[in-house]
Amino acid sequence: MDEQVFKGDPDTPHSISFSGSGFLSYYQAGAVDALRDLAPRMLDTAHRFAGTSAGAVIAALVVCGIEMEKYLRVLNMGLAEVKKFFLGPLSPSCKMVQMMRQFLYDVLPEDSYKFATGKLHVSLTRVTDGENVVVSEYRSKEELIEALYCSCFVPVYCGFIPPTYRGERYIDGGFTSMQPCSFWTDSITISTFSSQQDICPRDCPTIFHDFRMFNFSFQFSLENITRMTHALFPPDLVILQEYYYRGYNDAVSYLRRLNAAYLDSPSKRVIFPRVEVYCQIEVALGHEPPPPSLQNLPALRRSPADSSQTHAQGSPKKDRKDSHSSAAPSVQTPESGCKESVESPVSLRVSISKQPSVSPLSPAQPVPVMRPTGPRDSCPINVQTPNPERGVKGALDSATERGMKDALASATDEQSTTTLPPVLLPAADSRGSKTGSSVPIGSPESPRLLLRSSQGATASRATLGLPPLSPSTPPAGPPVEDLGPERPTATGSPALSQLTGSAAPGTGKKAPHKPLLVEGPGEDSNTAKTMFKRKQKTNATRECFHRNAQSKKPASKLKSAPCPLNFPVLPKRVWVTYKPHPSRIQDYSYPEGVSGQNS
């Protein structure tokens, strides 16, 4: 049985065909370097080389024995020239074509036409009839360069007037034959685009949709569309270098397929031993990607200093967590007591501590430890102070510094805020605002209120365990309205109480009394804003009640009593009036017909 001969056998005559590639001739240069490094006999024994466009230049350099390094150096210079202009190679000022032509004059030897005659086949497209013409006979170096220049000329891209070869005008041969001389049975085809060629990119084997264009079968894929764009409008140099290595690796894969084919043949021999050695070296050097189990290995190898630093950074978080979770005020130390405080609602912007308030639901932030130097530096949770009088005074000064003086002055109708100290009461349960049940202010579950009266301050002092003020001290305002045991109501959410009429400081006149009504932000948030922005009326009516000037009957049961000077201290539990939504409030005075029916 005779030995079977395969295409690509270096001992038999064969041909090599280069397709059109444009700027992607980096790919073909990589394939040529792979053949020179690993299978030099394949290039030495090839008796024919064919090429079109930039592939014709590659074929001419291979025939003349010129290294690809020189061609890539000039190609890099042409790329830099194209990147100078906004239109790239379409710019009239671009001199890329002239640079490539000058390169051929410089690099080709004077007798290059002798080597190329009969061995180099250049594909051209004739302008007159649009037929494909293959040129293989050259009489001079200039004629060879003109044939190569005609094969690379793309109208409008390289110019508007086609060049001439032996009196005829020709343009790029890729318009009629992208892969020249593909009908040769012994031809090894090298293509930049993914197709059915011997050496070409292998994008996706599951796509079998091909389309034929320029007498060439293209594989329909997004990668091929990208390559067509890069061939005319070059990308960055890094991407073009990737094309070079891709061509090198694809040529190695082709040579390995030939080795496998000859191993199955009767000869049982490896015709390209350098390819197998090259592949073993690549595996030994570890150019393959590491397994997934070893990718996170550097992250696991950390020095003991890094681990100790991690523990040192984690300790403050633990300390902050412990200080935040502690609920007993009496156990807090001066160092840990002022680290965090509970954030109050927007309507109650009063905080005795000077530290920034942090919400319990927000993530813990590093807070510097500060030692309190006085009662006004103490935290709002720790309400026990060594000096009760100094503690209350510090709280009042801190509240005045926070800006409550201006807010209270606009809401109390030109009354001084120094005689009406705001008192911060314990926080209320959030469920109380939803149910609306009556809860006394003195209880721990009641909402936080700012009672603008001395009685509210006295009640809060009784709640906090402080000694009450002297009864001989005259109160700054009237007492909180007492509704009696038959109609107890209370606020279900944090709110601000409104002052009743009191005597202006420095004058003997008394201001008209106003009903003390407490409003919850859950019912109507706009009413609370109106309370602080607008000046209160001088009469006993509010904006939420309808005016009725003709009616003289005191239809309302809510009345304010004047405050005597010797008013006793309020009890521990104080009831305040809850004002519902304005749409649910009835008029003070009823019409005569309705009042008669009710009677």
Swiss-Prot record:
Question: Quick one: where's region Disordered?
Answer: 289-563
Task: Give the UniProt keywords, A-Z.
Answer: Cytoplasm, Lipid biosynthesis, Lipid metabolism, Transferase
User: Where located?
Assistant: Cytoplasm
Keyword Cytoplasm assigned to the entry: answer is yes
E.C. number(s) listed in UniProt: 2.3.1.296
Ranges of compositional bias, category Polar residues: 325-335, 350-362, 490-501
Enzyme's top EC category:
transferase
Please tell me in which tissues this protein is expressed: Specifically expressed in skin by keratinocytes, at the boundary area between the nucleated stratum granulosum and the denucleated stratum corneum in the epidermis (at protein level). Also expressed in stomach and other surface lining tissues like intestine and tongue. Also detected in testis as well as in other tissues but at very low level.
- Locations of Low complexity compositional bias? 443-454, 551-563
Name of this chain's protein: Omega-hydroxyceramide transacylase
Origin species: Mus musculus (Mouse)
Q: Which gene encodes it?
A: Pnpla1
